[in-house]
């Protein structure tokens, strides 16, 4: 009898906490707050609305160490993952791959990309392999990290001037964007807009995105885009944005912008995402990618 009661309590506990991971907020507004403490921040984030707040005055060393010039020195020849925004809008495309370039090469590419369609993200490995970068990122944890976290991920995002990422959403417990150089323009819409965004679940790259280009929609999506209501904000240097799970968002980069991302997940969040995680690993192990060789420069070709 006692054992049955314990099992019931355990199942009830799991149900309450896992179901909380699926809760969504649909209010079309962005909260703004003055940072007071991590406890206060977690209370506001639990409402699952976008939250904009100043973090530069709270942890100035983080922003000072990750400026555009410092990132160039820290990354230099490190290889970053580069994507072309246009690949997301190819008809019937369900997966978008990346190429790897040294950060210096990407920096040069972004400066000559007049059309604004290259950006880099998914650079978690670079940060984990760099003791200096890991140390800098860990300084922000006491101000952002919720309780009972079992998984922490950091990222560096940047793009050509004017590059606009596709509408996407995530399922993490906490995800923050922090601008350390330049500025970004973020557009967001709640989960209920998914019926107009034609959601694509890319389990090969564990990415959930929309093939609908909000800025210049394909004629087949134009009627749907007119029904989408959005909120938007500009994030300057020193500010942070909490992106709630299941909120669609798109980022527009300005010149020389550096965005740092911190993502935190609890055991309950990982449990709630097990079906998607399993599909990702199955897809990952069953997919064989062909690595494209870089195009040789004219001078190199002549030497062959």
For the regions a protein language model found, what residue spans apply to each?
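N-terminal accessory scaffold of Fe(II)-dependent oxygenases
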Residues: 1-240, 248-304
């Amino acid at each position: 009898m006692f054992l049955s009661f314990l099992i019931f309590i355990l199942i009830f506990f799991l149900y309450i906490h896992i179901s909380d991971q699926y809760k969504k907020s649909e209010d079309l507004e962005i909260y703004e707050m003055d940072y007071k403490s991590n406890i206060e921040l977690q209370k506001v984030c639990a409402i699952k609305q976008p939250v904009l707040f100043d973090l530069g005055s709270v942890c100035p060393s983080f922003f000072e160490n990750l400026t555009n010039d410092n990132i160039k020195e820290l990354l230099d020849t490190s290889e970053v993952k580069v994507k072309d925004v246009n690949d997301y809008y190819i008809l019937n495309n369900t997966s978008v791959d990346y190429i790897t370039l040294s950060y210096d090469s990407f920096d040069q590419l972004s400066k000559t990309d007049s059309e604004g369609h290259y950006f880099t993200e998914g650079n978690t490995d670079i940060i984990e392999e760099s003791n200096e970068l890991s140390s800098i990122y860990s300084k922000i944890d006491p101000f952002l990290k919720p309780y009972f976290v079992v998984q922490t991920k950091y990222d560096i995002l940047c793009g050509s001037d004017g590059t606009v990422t596709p509408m996407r959403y995530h399922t993490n417990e906490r995800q923050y964007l922090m601008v350390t150089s330049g500025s970004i323009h973020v557009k967001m819409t709640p989960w209920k807009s998914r019926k107009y965004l034609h959601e694509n679940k890319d389990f090969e790259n564990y990415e959930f995105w929309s093939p609908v280009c909000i800025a210049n929609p394909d004629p087949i999506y134009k009627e749907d885009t007119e029904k989408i209501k959005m909120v938007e904000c500009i994030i300057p240097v020193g500010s942070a944005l909490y992106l709630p799970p299941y909120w669609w968002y798109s980022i527009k980069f300005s010149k020389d912008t550096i965005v740092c991302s911190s993502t935190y997940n609890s055991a309950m969040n990982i449990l709630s995402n097990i079906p998607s995680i399993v599909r990702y690993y199955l897809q990952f192990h069953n997919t064989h990618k062909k690595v494209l060789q870089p195009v040789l420069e004219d001078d190199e070709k002549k030497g062959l």
